[in-house]
Amino acid sequence: MNKLSLFLGCIVPNRYPGIEKATKLCLQRLEIDACDLPGASCCPAPGVFKSFDKATWLALASRNIVLSERMERDVLTVCNGCYGSLADANMELKKDPEMKACTNSCLKEIGMEFRGTSEIRHIIEFLYKEFGPEKLKEYITTPLDLKVALHYGCHLIKPSKDRNLGDTESPVFFDELVEATGAKSVDYTDKMMCCGAGGGVRSGYADESLEMLEHKLDCICKAGVDCIVNACPFCHLQFDRGQIAVNEKFGTDYSIPVLHYSQLLGLALGFSPDQLGIEQNAVQNIEFLAKIYEISAGLS
C-alpha cells in the first residue's frame, strides 16, 4: 500500500470542513499513511476547463500531481470531480509523449516537471481495492442501524474503460462499503442518475439542475431511507443546500440528511457526529441527529 497525499479540492475546505475532519479521522483509525498536500490548487473542474482549454487543464492538473510526486506519494481524493480531473490528466500525460512534453514546457516556467510516478486514488476506490468490505468490517466498533440511499455520482465510475471498477452500469462496490458499516443500502428509482450539479449545470442552468435534483429527492424519499450518502463534496452540496432551493422552488418539504461516506464510516468507527462535522450541514433533521447520537452512545 503506497503512501498518500490528501487532495481536498475546493468545496471541502471552503464549505464542508467536516468532511475533511471525518476523512482524516478515518484514515488515522485505519492506519493509512496519508498527509496534507501543501500548495495544492483547484483540480481544476473537468467539466469546465477541460471542455474549452485542454492545455490549461493539463497544466493545472499536472501541477497538483507533481506536488505529490515530489513527496513520493500517490494522490488520494475525496471528490468525484477531483478524481476525474486528476486521474484523466495523469493517464493522458502518461500515454501521450507529445502532450506530456507540451505540458512540461509550461511546468518548466515554475520549476516543475511531470514524471508520471504517482497514481490517483479516490477514497472509495482505494478502500474497496486495498481493504475490501470484509477487512473493513474488522475495524467497525459501532454497527449502524441505518437505511441509506447511496449516490455514486458520475466521475467515480465514468469513463468506465478507465476506472477499472467492474460493472459501472449497475455497480455494487460502493454499496458493499456502505453495508460494511452495518447500514443497509436501499435501492431506489434512477439511483445512477446525475444529481444535477456537475458539468456546469448547477451554475449555468439552475432551473434544470433543481428539476433533476427534485426528481432524485422524490425517488429517494419514496424509498424510505434515513439519509443520503455520497462520495463527492459537489454532489453533497447539491443534495444538502440544493434541498433548500428545491423546497423554495417547488413548495416541497424535503429534509433528508446528507452524509459523505467518510462521515458514515466515521460513525461506524466510533466517532461522534460532532467530531465528524455532521451538524454543519444545511439540512438539519432533528430525528436523524438524535438517532445517530444514540447509536454513537451505544443506546440504540
Curated annotation (Swiss-Prot):
<dbReference type="GO" id="GO:0046872">
    <property type="term" value="F:metal ion binding"/>
</dbReference>
<keyword id="KW-0004">4Fe-4S</keyword>
<comment type="function">
    <text>Part of a complex that catalyzes the reversible reduction of CoM-S-S-CoB to the thiol-coenzymes H-S-CoM (coenzyme M) and H-S-CoB (coenzyme B).</text>
</comment>
<dbReference type="GO" id="GO:0005737">
    <property type="term" value="C:cytoplasm"/>
</dbReference>
<keyword id="KW-0560">Oxidoreductase</keyword>
<dbReference type="GO" id="GO:0015948">
    <property type="term" value="P:methanogenesis"/>
</dbReference>
<dbReference type="Pfam" id="PF02754">
    <property type="entry name" value="CCG"/>
</dbReference>
<dbReference type="GO" id="GO:0051912">
    <property type="term" value="F:CoB--CoM heterodisulfide reductase activity"/>
</dbReference>
<keyword id="KW-0484">Methanogenesis</keyword>
<keyword id="KW-0963">Cytoplasm</keyword>
<keyword id="KW-0411">Iron-sulfur</keyword>
<comment type="pathway">
    <text>Cofactor metabolism; coenzyme M-coenzyme B heterodisulfide reduction; coenzyme B and coenzyme M from coenzyme M-coenzyme B heterodisulfide: step 1/1.</text>
</comment>
<dbReference type="GO" id="GO:0051539">
    <property type="term" value="F:4 iron, 4 sulfur cluster binding"/>
</dbReference>
<dbReference type="InterPro" id="IPR004017">
    <property type="entry name" value="Cys_rich_dom"/>
</dbReference>
<keyword id="KW-0479">Metal-binding</keyword>
<protein>
    <recommendedName>
        <fullName>Ferredoxin:CoB-CoM heterodisulfide reductase subunit B</fullName>
        <ecNumber>1.8.7.3</ecNumber>
    </recommendedName>
</protein>
<dbReference type="InterPro" id="IPR051278">
    <property type="entry name" value="HdrB/HdrD_reductase"/>
</dbReference>
<keyword id="KW-0408">Iron</keyword>
<comment type="similarity">
    <text>Belongs to the HdrB family.</text>
</comment>
<comment type="subunit">
    <text>The ferredoxin:CoB-CoM heterodisulfide reductase is composed of three subunits; HdrA, HdrB and HdrC.</text>
</comment>
<dbReference type="InterPro" id="IPR017678">
    <property type="entry name" value="CoB/CoM_hetero-S_Rdtase_bsu"/>
</dbReference>
